[in-house]
Curated annotation (Swiss-Prot):
It is an enzyme of class 3 (hydrolase). Residues 9-99 form the Acylphosphatase-like domain. Belongs to the acylphosphatase family. This is Acylphosphatase-1. Keywords: Hydrolase. InterPro entries: Acylphosphatase, Acylphosphatase-like_dom, Acylphosphatase-like_dom_sf, Acylphosphatase_CS. Its EC number is 3.6.1.7. It comes from Xenopus laevis (African clawed frog).
Length: 99
């Protein structure tokens, strides 16, 4: 019997030209494609913040996507990840865009 890996959670903040370029919509779509849950929102400081939850391999893929790709018109200058932790179970059921 193979033991299922505990999901992980990580918070992120993306800097650069990430507002007004559909960054949240593309982030939600990529999170859904990878089977992740969490959320994404714009900040008053012009950044995008959020949380990723799911299998560590998929979370790592999403971290690379946030650093290297983003939405087609975005210009990412920096991404900060913090508060990484293992979870007994997922805390979200979907990947949502917060207003």
């Amino acid at each position: 019997m193979v033991e299922e890996e505990q999901p992980i959670s990580v918070d992120y903040e993306v800097f650069g030209k990430v507002q007004g370029v559909f960054f949240r919509k593309y982030t939600q779509a990529e999170g859904n494609r990878l089977g992740l849950v969490g959320w994404v929102r714009n900040t008053d400081a012009g950044t995008v913040t959020g949380q990723l939850q799911g299998p560590s391999e998929k979370v790592r893929e999403m971290q690379v996507w946030l650093q290297k790709k983003g939405s087609p018109k975005s210009r990412i200058t920096k991404v900060q990840f913090q508060n990484e932790r293992r979870l007994p179970k997922l805390e979200h059921s979907t990947f949502s865009i917060c207003k």
